[in-house]
Amino acid sequence: MPMLDAMQTQRAVRLLITSKPVAHEVLLRLLELSLKAPTRTNTQDWTYLVVEDPEQKARIGTVYGRLYKLFNPIVTRQAKGDAQELRNMAPGQWQAEHFAEIPVFVIPCYRTSVNHRPTGRPQIRVSSFYGSVYPAVQNLLLACRAVGLGASLQTLPVWWQPSIRKILDLPRDVRPVCIIPIGWAKGRYGPTQRTPIGEVVHLDHYGNQPFRDPVG
């Protein structure tokens, strides 16, 4: 799939074929492409954990299930009465119920032990951490879409850091950023619908939106 088509049709794909594995040669090529993304001063302070072992996936799935049961009722209440929003939530429900069956998890992590690690105020450190990892994450999501794999960015499973760190045997200087469940996508996906660009672009200062369509 051409890259522009992948970008125009990208979405969080949660409905996956659980019985079809993702070959290592395919996954490694996608991970290699994802790491073409830039990092702060080219420190390349990232690392990936690939989880395929059923027992490991089940352990992570247990953590995810507990958090999902905790937070999903809140989201469901917020969507009450909105039929479209409730339909949009259905793939997430399926994913939560089948999380451990998904063929592979990719867990991008940040290594704080590299040189030039950010210092100073917490917001500076956090923005530097994520700014060095999320460009590669987006590359991976696009690469998956381009070859027909479904993928979604999940942060909920890593909210419970102590459990995830213990399951994955993570050293102190390696921080999980998110979990990306990956498998071959079920169904076909057309272009995504987004807010018109004129509604979200401000020129020179906030509130100046010359690209908006005139009302009426």
Q: What positions do the PLM features span?
A:
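N-terminal targeting/leader regions
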Residues: 1-21, 25-33, 37, 42
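C-terminal helix-cap and adjacent tail motif
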Residues: 6-9, 13, 177-216
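Glycine-rich, charged/polar anion/phosphate-binding loops
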Residues: 32-35, 89-94, 164-167, 187
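Small-aliphatic-rich amphipathic alpha-helix that forms the alpha element of a beta-alpha
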Residues: 32-34, 106, 112, 118-166
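Short loop-to-beta-strand entry elements in the cores of soluble alpha/beta enzymes
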Residues: 41-52
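Short connector loops at helix/strand junctions that flank enzyme active sites
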Residues: 43-45, 99-104, 175
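Glycine/small-residue-rich phosphate/adenosyl-binding loop
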Residues: 50-133
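A glycine-rich helix N-cap at a beta->alpha junction
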Residues: 69-79, 167-193
